[in-house]
């Protein structure tokens, strides 16, 4: 975590932290004004929101990075697919080398590597066979392709709360219950893209990492969610569900980590959560290498981490599934036995019935299913 991010996520910065963040005070004001103006233009219809021709469920957040949107998007897409819907996920594709519209998966299998699709679309495509994944900055264009070319009849808009150019039928806002707003400020003084009053636009609040939140904080967030949306929140924890090797094949039980000396490799917005996961699994983290969020690892970087891990007496280099799709594939496969990948999923602790009811409402005006297109789009 950089020095700036440390200021962002420190909830009580103290005198020194406040002093360090003071130069950003003047920069926060124009960002706040611009966000408010943009929101008002959408609220009044001056800026239009395009209808997609299929129900849209947006998964987003207020802060930048690390709230747990990807597990939430996986869970929502899987639930929609389980209802017999032809689901497509629309993603910005952060970390991709290209910025044009791309089909990362047509629902029959992944078509693009993470370098072209972005890490989150690549992970979603891998985890959700049968679900199309499209990526690019113009989500309305992606929605049109998904509906007209791929026959999608339900769309999941990943990281879409601020992307108001595409109309949605349900806005799900994910908050990290252990630290939802950081220092409370907007960019660049703090981590938030909008003030918490923006939650009034949401249809549902999803509290991730609810197992890590103090009881009094959790109750306060429940009240905030109910006041903003009229619904109780969904609450979840990040539950480790599988252990994979460097080639992303099953590699035995998660119990294999217990008592093992390991090196942790990550490129996440908030890597401390990954370290806590490893420690909870009983691993001894002897070495930690944290890169910036969405970092595309080079072969040289992976080789260096493997060497350092060997020197530290580590049995494995362990990373997240989201990071694993950004590793050099050939080198990761060659070093498969020295790498381990921890898969995590969102385990619902409370609010499963609330989520189902919210999805029911979003799908209420859904068009009748149409025949799938005759030929896949490449």
UniProtKB/Swiss-Prot annotation:
SUPFAM superfamilies, per database record: P-loop containing nucleoside triphosphate hydrolases (SSF52540)
Keyword annotations from UniProtKB, A to Z: ATP-binding, Kinase, Lipid A biosynthesis, Lipid biosynthesis, Lipid metabolism, Nucleotide-binding, Transferase
Root EC class: transferase
One of the record's GO cellular component terms: plasma membrane
Record pathway: Glycolipid biosynthesis; lipid IV(A) biosynthesis; lipid IV(A) from (3R)-3-hydroxytetradecanoyl-[acyl-carrier-protein] and UDP-N-acetyl-alpha-D-glucosamine: step 6/6
A Pfam family matched in the record: LpxK
Catalyzed reactions per annotation: a lipid A disaccharide + ATP = a lipid IVA + ADP + H(+)
InterPro entries noted in UniProt: LpxK, P-loop_NTPase
GO molecular function: ATP binding; tetraacyldisaccharide 4'-kinase activity
E.C. no: 2.7.1.130
Source organism, top-level taxon: Bacteria
GO biological process per UniProt: lipid A biosynthetic process; lipopolysaccharide core region biosynthetic process
Annotated ATP binding sites: 63-70
Task performed by this protein: Transfers the gamma-phosphate of ATP to the 4'-position of a tetraacyldisaccharide 1-phosphate intermediate (termed DS-1-P) to form tetraacyldisaccharide 1,4'-bis-phosphate (lipid IVA).
Family: Belongs to the LpxK family.
NCBIfam families in the cross-refs: lpxK
Name of protein: Tetraacyldisaccharide 4'-kinase
Gene behind the chain: lpxK
């Amino acid at each position: 975590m950089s020095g700036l991010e440390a200021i962002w996520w420190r909830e009580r910065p103290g005198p020194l932290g406040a002093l360090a963040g003071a130069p950003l005070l003047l920069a926060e004001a124009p960002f706040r004004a611009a966000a408010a103006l943009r929101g008002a233009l959408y609220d009044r219809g001056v800026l239009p929101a395009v209808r997609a021709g299929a129900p849209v469920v947006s998964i987003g957040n207020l802060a930048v990075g690390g709230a747990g949107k990807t597990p939430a998007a996986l869970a929502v897409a899987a639930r929609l697919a389980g209802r017999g819907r032809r689901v497509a996920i629309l993603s910005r594709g952060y970390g991709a080398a290209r910025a044009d519209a791309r089909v990362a998966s047509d629902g029959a299998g992944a078509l693009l590597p993470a370098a072209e699709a972005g890490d989150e679309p690549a992970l979603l495509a891998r985890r959700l066979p049968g679900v199309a994944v499209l990526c690019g900055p113009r989500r309305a264009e992606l929605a049109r392709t998904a509906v007209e070319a791929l026959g999608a009849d339900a769309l999941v808009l990943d990281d879409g709360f601020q992307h108001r150019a595409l109309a949605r039928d349900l806005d799900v806002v994910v908050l990290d219950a252990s630290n939802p707003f950081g220092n409370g400020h907007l960019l660049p003084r703090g981590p938030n893209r909008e003030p918490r009053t923006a939650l009034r636009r949401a249809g549902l609040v999803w509290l991730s990492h609810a197992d890590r939140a103090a009881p009094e904080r959790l109750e306060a967030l429940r009240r905030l969610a109910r006041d903003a949306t009229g619904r109780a929140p969904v609450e979840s924890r990040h539950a480790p569900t599988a252990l994979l090797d460097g080639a992303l094949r099953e590699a035995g039980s998660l119990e294999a980590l217990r008592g093992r000396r390991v090196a942790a490799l990550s490129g996440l917005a908030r890597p401390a959560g990954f370290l806590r996961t490893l420690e909870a699994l009983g691993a001894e983290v002897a070495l930690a290498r944290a890169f910036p969020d969405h970092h595309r690892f080079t072969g040289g970087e992976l080789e260096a981490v493997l060497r350092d891990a060997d020197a530290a007496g580590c049995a494995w280099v362990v990373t997240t599934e989201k990071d694993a799709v950004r590793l050099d594939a050939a080198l990761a496969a060659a070093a498969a036995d020295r790498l381990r990948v921890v898969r995590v999923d969102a385990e619902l602790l409370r609010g499963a019935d609330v989520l189902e009811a919210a999805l029911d409402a979003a799908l209420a005006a859904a068009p009748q299913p149409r025949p799938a297109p005759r030929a896949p789009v490449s």
